[in-house]
């Protein structure tokens, strides 16, 4: 069985991500320090809360440098995806810088609520193993106030008062702005695709 490291980033979604993986036949290893990453074939970075708090927690756990050196597939979920980028407007905080781009606050408008909360459509942009067998018009469940504008690494977008990156992949570095663990069959398929993607 593939060794999956699930980083305890302090978010409320940790248990639901673990349960989603268990439904796929995977018992993840909860990780609180660098030693926990040893031998992992896949790494998952979930996150709920604020970017400054999450980066401080990763620093306190001694996980920033190990994540920067990581060679195996990594996926960030929700805030975890935002942390993969260079900088977040939330608290004006530097992030991991594993992917080029900056996290911006969503702009509210009369018909656009922030936070963006609920089901919304995934709009594929280019081929990616993460999207294998995900049907056209699939929806995912979002809860966020910040997002990454479209980048060259984006493989799917979402429209909420403007387009933003919903799924990102650059080599083995991946992210989902939505919550796959709360996105029914679509989310389960994307998690399975991540677990099964080529590690090279």
UniProtKB/Swiss-Prot annotation:
Active-site residue numbers: 78 (nucleophile), 179, 181
UniProt GO MF annotations: glutaminase activity; imidazoleglycerol-phosphate synthase activity; lyase activity
Residue stretches making up the Glutamine amidotransferase type-1 domain: 3-200
This enzyme's EC code(s): 4.3.2.10, 3.5.1.2
Pathways per UniProt: Amino-acid biosynthesis; L-histidine biosynthesis; L-histidine from 5-phospho-alpha-D-ribose 1-diphosphate: step 5/9
Compartment annotation: Cytoplasm
Entry keyword annotation includes Plastid: no
Keyword Hydrolase appears in the UniProt entry: yes
Domain of life where this protein originates: Bacteria
Entry GO terms, CC: cytoplasm
UniProt catalytic activity: 5-[(5-phospho-1-deoxy-D-ribulos-1-ylimino)methylamino]-1-(5-phospho-beta-D-ribosyl)imidazole-4-carboxamide + L-glutamine = D-erythro-1-(imidazol-4-yl)glycerol 3-phosphate + 5-amino-1-(5-phospho-beta-D-ribosyl)imidazole-4-carboxamide + L-glutamate + H(+); L-glutamine + H2O = L-glutamate + NH4(+)
Family annotation (PROSITE patterns): GATASE_TYPE_1
Name of one Pfam family that matches: GATase
Keywords of the record: Amino-acid biosynthesis, Cytoplasm, Glutamine amidotransferase, Histidine biosynthesis, Hydrolase, Lyase
InterPro entries attached to this UniProt entry: Class_I_gatase-like (IPR029062), GATASE (IPR017926), Imidazole-glycPsynth_HisH (IPR010139)
Primary location: cytoplasm
Function: IGPS catalyzes the conversion of PRFAR and glutamine to IGP, AICAR and glutamate. The HisH subunit catalyzes the hydrolysis of glutamine to glutamate and ammonia as part of the synthesis of IGP and AICAR. The resulting ammonia molecule is channeled to the active site of HisF.
Subunit structure: Heterodimer of HisH and HisF.
Protein name (record): Imidazole glycerol phosphate synthase subunit HisH
Organism from which the protein derives: Xylella fastidiosa (strain Temecula1 / ATCC 700964)
Name of encoding gene: hisH
């Amino acid at each position: 069985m593939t060794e999956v490291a699930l980083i305890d980033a302090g978010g409320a979604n940790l248990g639901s991500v673990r349960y989603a993986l268990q439904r796929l036949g995977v018992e993840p290893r909860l990780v609180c320090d660098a030693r926990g990453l040893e031998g992992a074939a896949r790494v998952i970075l979930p996150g709920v809360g604020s970017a400054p708090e999450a980066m401080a927690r990763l620093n306190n756990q001694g996980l920033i440098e190990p994540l920067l050196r990581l060679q195996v597939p990594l996926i960030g979920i929700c805030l975890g995806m935002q942390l993969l980028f260079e900088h977040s407007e939330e608290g004006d905080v530097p992030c991991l810088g594993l992917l080029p781009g900056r996290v911006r606050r969503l702009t509210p408008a009369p018909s656009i609520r922030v936070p963006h909360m609920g089901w919304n459509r995934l709009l594929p942009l280019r081929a990616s193993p993460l999207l294998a067998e995900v049907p056209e018009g699939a929806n995912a469940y979002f809860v966020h106030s910040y997002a990454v504008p479209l980048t060259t690494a984006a493989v799917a977008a979402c429209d909420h008062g403007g387009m933003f990156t919903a799924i990102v992949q650059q080599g083995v570095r991946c992210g989902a702005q939505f919550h796959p663990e709360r996105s029914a069959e679509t989310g389960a398929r994307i998690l399975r695709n991540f677990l099964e993607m080529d590690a090279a």
